[in-house]
Amino acid sequence: MTVQNPQEPEYFPEVFPQDAFPQYAWDEGMRPITLPHEVWLSETTHRDGQQGGLPLSLDTSRRIYDILCEITGDSTAIRHAEFFPYRDSDRNALIYALERHRDGAPIEPTTWIRARREDVELIKRIGVIETGLLSSSSDYHTFHKFGSGGRTQAASMYLDAVTMALDHGIRPRVHLEDTTRSSPDFVRALVEEVLKTAERYPAELQPRFRVCDTLGIGLPYDDVSLPRSIPRWIRLLRGFGLSPSQIELHPHNDTWLVVANCLAAIREGCGVISGTTLGTGERTGNAPLEAVMVHLLGMGYWSGARVNLPAVNKLVELYEGIGAGPSQKYPFFGRDAYVTRAGIHADGLNKFWWMYAPFNAPLLTGRELDVALTKDSGQAGLLFVLNKRLGLQLEKGDPRVAEVLAWMDRQWDAGRVSAVEWSELEPVVEKAFATEEGVG
């Protein structure tokens, strides 16, 4: 037999450390040379999250901003938060964030506005120093918003707004809406004109460009053609000599590739990802920034400071309180993200905790591994729950466990299909254990 048993198990600790998220291990010489030196995130919950149906009162908006600041801490992971400036409640939330930022909060508030002179005037009065400018770039938009003027009229309007922003000392972020259905020729021409316009302004006002996968149809592959290839769009913009921090990706999740597209963009040299924590947003949502963070941490970004991902749980609680919580099976922070229902998996957890743990979830996310007691969880699932709840080391064959399991089996035999909650099981356990073991 050619299979030989090693003296010690191989757990690949350099890839799966017990105190960090899984790491990206590059073979020698294979780390992508286009990876940016630094990557950071732009949070758009106050804009796209709200636009997608998140019900934000002024108080809720303030609390979200504060939680986002708690998540990023001094890591610089999240540097921008994007706001609407139009309604009173949105302006008041924006002003609150601006005041907090001036007092030292780590996230700089920016805005999303239409490429109109009056909108630029509005944010100048508020005191914003960077803004996104809606610059629809596909013919699906230009030919139907500007009629016969099409691309020419659209470009003229965008450039006028860019110039006005620069004149007011506001850094423009050109949002190339619907990039993944846009003509590369038009995008090249528009970017070239924007950069030419900005030449006479100082470095801190040089524009950023947001690649918008507005309908989530972008692909993370560089061997497919434009306009759908996200890496090729990033490469096109890098070709203008733009730094990674001048290029931003804003993807949607309509075809399930939102995180893959973020990672593909970063690999190609994009330095900023726009999304929302917990993935809220228009239609199927934006890039879930906590997921992007996990991958970037695995690549070694922000290694000098702690990203406080367990603080995302505060956002989960807040959203649940306004009826907009994540689904139970939402990765990382859903109620059931680390809950198994299969007895064979529960048996693995009992034997070796790491067998069915992708990483140290309690440490890194503040979420416990658990087992739901169902008809499929069996004795192994019950053992896991009892040992966790009672602080014991019970084993299979314990008659007290058998008594509780028999009660559960009667539930399934009677046609029950829902999980058994601890509140139901506790009196059964107390009776079986006669309370002297300290059931609690």
Curated annotation (Swiss-Prot):
Optimum pH is 8. Can also use magnesium, calcium and iron ions with lower efficiency. The keyword Transferase applies. Strongly inhibited by p-chloromercuribenzoate (pCMB), iodoacetamide (IA) and EDTA. Keywords: Antibiotic biosynthesis, Cobalt, Manganese, Transferase. Pathway: Secondary metabolite biosynthesis; bialaphos biosynthesis. Optimum temperature is 30 degrees Celsius. One of its GO terms (biological process) is antibiotic biosynthetic process. Its EC number is 2.3.3.18. Residues 39-313 form the Pyruvate carboxyltransferase domain. Its cofactor is Mn(2+); Co(2+). InterPro entries: Aldolase_TIM (IPR013785), PYR_CT (IPR000891). It catalyses: 3-(hydrohydroxyphosphoryl)pyruvate + acetyl-CoA + H2O = phosphinomethylmalate + CoA + H(+). Belongs to the alpha-IPM synthase/homocitrate synthase family. Involved in the biosynthesis of phosphinothricin tripeptide (PTT), also known as bialaphos (BA), a natural-product antibiotic and potent herbicide. Catalyzes the condensation berween phosphinopyruvic acid (PPA), an analog of oxalacetic acid, and acetyl-CoA to form R-2-phosphinomethylmalic acid (PMM). Can also act on oxaloacetate, but shows no activity when acetyl-CoA is substituted by propionyl-CoA or butyryl-CoA. Homodimer. This is 2-phosphinomethylmalate synthase.
